[in-house]
Amino acid sequence: MYICSVTCKNTKMKRIERHNYLQKLIAFKDKKLIKVITGIRRCGKSTIMEIYRDWLVAHGVMQEQIIYLNFEDYDYFELRDPRKLYSYVKPLIQQDKMTYIFFDEIQHVTDFPDIINSLNLKPTVDLYVTG
């Protein structure tokens, strides 16, 4: 069983165990499907993605194989433009091993279906989105 904890506001808090959700993501790992995590606002979609990213690293995936962007973060505001997002992500895609791409709150990206469909065509991309 995989249980994580996260440090928040200088106190150690345990995350709610999401074993079933984690197992579902693991079952679809490296499959050419776009994995979409849905739910009401503040229900833990981003946390599930974080737990899964931690699981990937714990199971041998290197950090440089993981791309995570949260489009609610103003640091990534420019990447809401589809051409800029594609130009940013494409050079980060590994050619000889799988690249795991996580887009959090993808709905903020203009024409996001075009971007995720295009990225999903790449043979070494495993794509996960919330929004």
Where are these regions (language model features)?
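Phosphate-binding site recognition
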Residues: 1-131
